[in-house]
Amino acid sequence: PKKAEAKFSIKKKDDAAAKVGEDAQNAAAIKAHPLLARLQLGGGLSTVGYASVRDTAAINKIIYSEVAKRVLPSDLRLLWSAKPADNLKVKNIYELHALKVTTTTGRAPLEGDVITDAKDEFDQMGSPVVSMKMNTEGARKWAQMTKANVGKAIAIVLDGVVYSAPRVNGEI
């Protein structure tokens, strides 16, 4: 019995030491690479990376810093998804989107004033979608935007967060 207890306590000490070592490695990685230690790169289209909700504030400090403003392109906007990514096994992971500003004013090319009607519906696969109707000017501009961006994403942004950024498959 004493040997079993000794083995158990040694293993427990080893587990604790491993945890301390892992924590030290994580702290060193965060110190050496504060952004890359918190943001998992990848995603495709407009998504440049993923991060835990608990890391978004630290990432924001970096990506919205004065240094970042000097080195990142002036037409780049980095914005978080409105909701956690639903296609991941881990919960509370948000997508960071890279959006290109395409107007001289920095405003969206289309805004809410062109929407004449919007309602919740379900698509043919049973997934929830928002159906929108636009006025003539909005519909014309939307057709131009989708035609010019086939194969790329167009982000739907409200109050500074990305609600959707689907791939454009053709002019709409």
Briefly describe each language-model feature range.
Residues 170-172:
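A short acidic/small-residue loop/turn micro-motif
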Residues 1-168:
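Non-transmembrane, solvent-exposed regions of membrane trafficking/translocation machinery
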